[in-house]
Design a protein with these regions (language model features):
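Compact beta-sheet-dominated domain cores in extracellular/mature segments
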Residues: 1-85
Length: 85
């Protein structure tokens, strides 16, 4: 809880393109089974059927390199990962 969330430039609105090794480093922000979205938040269905939180359509992720709430070590990685703002 309190960990930084990121967006991935290679995703498309409503679609996650981060799987396998990518998802190992950038774990998706998975919604609880009974979650309901509202406002700018929505749910994106991943290939495995899991529901992932999205902001303005863009799927949200954590960065495995962040160890404490407020860490932003993933910001700018590869030029394609950005802190949710």
């Amino acid at each position: 809880e309190g960990m930084t969330l990121y967006i991935f430039d290679k995703d498309a609105p409503g679609t996650s393109n981060c799987y396998d090794g990518c998802a190992g480093s950038w774990p998706p922000f998975i919604a609880e089974t009974d979650a309901s979205a509202e406002g700018n938040f929505s749910l994106v269905t991943r290939k495995d059927g899991a529901e992932q939180w999205a902001f303005k359509g863009m799927p949200l992720y954590y960065w495995a390199g962040d160890s404490a709430p407020g860490d932003v070590n993933g910001d700018g990685v590869g030029g394609v990962w950005h802190v949710l703002k």
